[in-house]
Amino acid sequence: MDTNNNIEKEILALVKQNPKVSLIEYENYFSQLKYNPNASKSDIAFFYAPNQVLCTTITAKYGALLKEILSQNKVGMHLAHSVDVRIEVAPKIQINAQSNINYKAIKTSVKDSYTFENFVVGSCNNTVYEIAKKVAQSDTPPYNPVLFYGGTGLGKTHILNAIGNHALEKHKKVVLVTSEDFLTDFLKHLDNKTMDSFKAKYRHCDFFLLDDAQFLQGKPKLEEEFFHTFNELHANSKQIVLISDRSPKNIAGLEDRLKSRFEWGITAKVMPPDLETKLSIVKQKCQLNQITLPEEVMEYIAQHISDNIRQMEGAIIKISVNANLMNASIDLNLAKTVLEDLQKDHAEGSSLENILLAVAQSLNLKSSEIKVSSRQKNVALARKLVVYFARLYTPNPTLSLAQFLDLKDHSSISKMYSGVKKMLEEEKSPFVLSLREEIKNRLNELNDKKTAFNSSE
């Protein structure tokens, strides 16, 4: 007779092979079920689901199908002709109390200076702000997980720490960690053979907050450990909040099962700030750094420095330092001179590949999707934006650009470029205006990385 472990594999294999169950459905639902041999009988198959939502969903949507599959197939447990299927919520796993965790040490990873009160809210980030506040204020997760994504320096880390600080005020156990630190800690415990302590540390908390989630990709052992950490936290209704620079589907090399779990709850994009929000940020940073700038200088910074909040703060400090060194008063002319190098457009000389990647990341598409003509609106817009930025920043002739985008008629390039240019000049689409800034920021980042790499060779 088959062992219980083989029975479980055999039952789940039957489900996976059934044509009525897609691979996505199997991964999202059935792969999480655990067969309970102790409760099962000859005519009843018992399974454990990690949480009530999954339990209810499978019972309602797939209960009849499960009974049909198991009734028609003889498996090692010798199921009767007519089989009843029961799915229950798994009992919560108790973590060994001997792992004496110093939560005070864990709390120090939350930066006290980042709060909801000093987060500048605008139309670009209002949705993210409201979701974050609701998550922080709720005793049980309203959405789980929550994933915020967007370009560098837009306030994602601030909002993550704000959630942590609010949760700590309610005496919740909070773990905030970057994926890099999570990896370092994982390897240390692995080498020391203290994985029980590692699991207790990250799974026995009320809020698990992970920054730079995109860096989990390409590390199979780490992804495996995070997968199980995620599952246990989720099963025990512990709030998970993830931060990434791109949407889950655009994290190349990340396991599909993790991408799937990242999208279980709610995903929201942090957009680049509009001019009004940028000016509010500049004023706030001046106040925090106790620096007084004339109104016209603050407006100049908001208009001419990138959307990266850290760069805006750097510009403020640079003006103040230079004014002190030169014993000069701060005015617009001084600001223009001091900030000249910060206004350099690093997008100049971009490769077509980098432009394609920047557009793809900004619109949550795959590069391969953009290179093929499509009637989908977001793909069509992406192709136009690739043309627009290629004409601005690359020396590529029209013919090679047409070949790059698989266009038979290279005269279409001029039409696509003119269409985007007109849209931007007339300012009829705030969305496209915002996209232009985001794509430029991503190009700057990609080109800066390339420059840094070349200089190190």
Swiss-Prot record:
Residues 324-457 are annotated as: Domain IV, binds dsDNA. Residues 91-112 are annotated as: Domain II. It comes from the Bacteria. Residues 1-90 are annotated as: Domain I, interacts with DnaA modulators. SUPFAM superfamilies: P-loop containing nucleoside triphosphate hydrolases, TrpR-like. GO terms for biological process: DNA replication; DNA replication initiation; regulation of DNA replication. InterPro entries: AAA+_ATPase, Chromosome_initiator_DnaA, Chromosome_initiator_DnaA-like, Chromosome_initiator_DnaA_CS, DnaA_C, DnaA_dom, DnaA_N_sf, P-loop_NTPase. It is found in: Cytoplasm; Cell inner membrane. ATP binds at residues 153, 155-157. Residues 113-323 are annotated as: Domain III, AAA+ region. Plays an essential role in the initiation and regulation of chromosomal replication. ATP-DnaA binds to the origin of replication (oriC) to initiate formation of the DNA replication initiation complex once per cell cycle. Binds the DnaA box (a 9 base pair repeat at the origin) and separates the double-stranded (ds)DNA. Forms a right-handed helical filament on oriC DNA; dsDNA binds to the exterior of the filament while single-stranded (ss)DNA is stabiized in the filament's interior. The DnaA box is 5'-TTATC[CA]A[CA]A-3' in this bacterium cycle. Multiple discrete DnaA-oriC complexes can be seen as DnaA levels increase. Binding of DnaA to oriC is increased by HobA; some chi-type structures can be seen by electron microscopy. Strand separation requires the DnaA boxes and adjacent DnaA-trio motifs but works equally well with ADP or ATP. Oligomerizes as a right-handed, spiral filament on DNA at oriC. Interacts via domain I with HobA. In a crystal with domains I and II of DnaA HobA forms tetramers with DnaA fragments bound at the dimer interface of the tetramer. Belongs to the DnaA family. This is Chromosomal replication initiator protein DnaA. It comes from Helicobacter pylori (strain ATCC 700392 / 26695). The gene is dnaA.
